[in-house]
């Protein structure tokens, strides 16, 4: 393959990201997710001539992994959970900094960040074990089912959420987010090593 499909996919992703970013810039403030998407796709497109040997076979996998990175990074100290930038419009501004509101969104953001990192890990695993491609793909996409159910149902568990200490939980969430970021970095390095050595694909 000449990699043209990968280049076109990146260009389409950049165009979509730029459209969303521009719309949000006009009518509101772009979220960290939208800014990061624009930056990542711009960077990858600019570097395509030098990275095509890596991105052509691994672009989808790396994109999924780094989607997880974007989500997990918003759990780190000084950041606001990514999902809160979208869910806050359902509530009055006075609640946007409420500890319970931020706790719920930290749970959902952490969960989705890990879902994307795990999906990327299943891609790498499948590349190393072609005979497992089908079952691993089933597990990879199957993760979306419980994640979607939790996203819908967890915010409704008001009684359980009130028993949680948001301050203590924040430290655990940040630790788990850090582990996810380390895992994502390791998986990215693995795809680069696989490209350089010619193994897997």
Q: Where in this protein do the model-derived segments appear?
A:
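Membrane-interface helix caps and helix-loop-helix hairpins in membrane proteins
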Residues: 26-30, 49-57, 130-134
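Membrane-proximal helix-loop-helix units in multi-pass membrane proteins
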Residues: 51-104
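C-terminal ends of transmembrane helices
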Residues: 17-29, 151
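Cytoplasmic-side transmembrane-helix entry/capping segments in multi-pass membrane proteins
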Residues: 29-42, 57-66
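Alpha-helical transmembrane segments and their immediate juxtamembrane interface regions
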Residues: 132-172
């Amino acid at each position: 393959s000449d990699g043209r499909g990968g280049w076109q996919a990146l260009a389409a992703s950049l165009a979509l990201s730029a459209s969303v970013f521009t719309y949000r810039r006009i009518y509101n403030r772009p979220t960290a997710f939208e800014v990061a998407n624009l930056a990542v796709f711009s960077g990858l497109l600019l570097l395509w001539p030098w990275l095509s040997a890596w991105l052509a076979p691994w672009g989808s996998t790396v994109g999924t992994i780094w989607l997880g990175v974007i989500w997990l990074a918003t759990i780190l100290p000084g950041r606001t959970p990514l999902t809160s930038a979208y869910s806050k419009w359902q509530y009055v501004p006075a609640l946007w900094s409420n500890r319970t509101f931020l706790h719920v969104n930290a749970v959902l953001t952490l969960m989705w960040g890990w879902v994307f990192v795990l999906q990327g890990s299943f891609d790498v695993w499948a590349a190393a074990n072609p005979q497992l491609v089908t079952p691993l793909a089933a597990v990879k996409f199957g993760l979306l089912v419980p994640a979607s159910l939790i996203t819908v149902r967890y915010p409704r568990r008001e009684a359980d959420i009130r028993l949680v200490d948001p301050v203590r939980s924040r430290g655990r969430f940040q630790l788990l987010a850090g582990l996810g970021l380390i895992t994502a970095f390791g998986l990215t390095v693995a795809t680069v090593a696989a490209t350089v050595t010619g193994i897997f694909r």
